[in-house]
């Protein structure tokens, strides 16, 4: 068995290889002047089981094409099973069918299967609907157990869902730690800007902990933090799985933000704390390989 790293998760792939005692391979990737990608794997792969590690985070489309080339090259080189570790599944927010727009998540699922992926491991999909798009085994690993040691240190706290999509995660954590819950109702206007309209639960004088899967522009988290402060919150912290961070984000109202390393990030504010996903990936891979 061998581990092949894409451009987006080299450090994670290296750590997986060391922990699992599997040979690490880094493909040769070059770019033409028009930004076309050329990819070569200069290692024999005949009859080998392969683990490919690649998130499709920014630049999303480049990394997606790179991933397709990685899988296709490995398959043509004679790889047997191909396990794809895709910590962050880009385009998962576009999972709804429409007559007016494509459904990229379905297309990606189709491509991955046709190219030869035999098992997909991903972390905290934005929508659980994505799992139903695949005909191959898929492991949607939740990071909640990684959060628990940190959450247990908070006193006088309440777990808050910033929108409907976070409800299940919040309730799971609340049940595990026997902590009170609060729910924010979020609406979007015609410009797709979000507005917090209602809160269920008493946050006054409490240390609030927001739980979400993605921080991108930071609008939801910022407005949720502001809404909580308006309702008397003592402090606001956040646990967020994927640090997409594609725009200038405002985190002034938050005390601390915990994110995982599904996406390799640089130059983060001192308010950020990175939680490694290595333990849960190693556990899942050991169940498969």
Give the role of each language-model region.
Residues 1-289:
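PRPP-associated nucleotide enzymes
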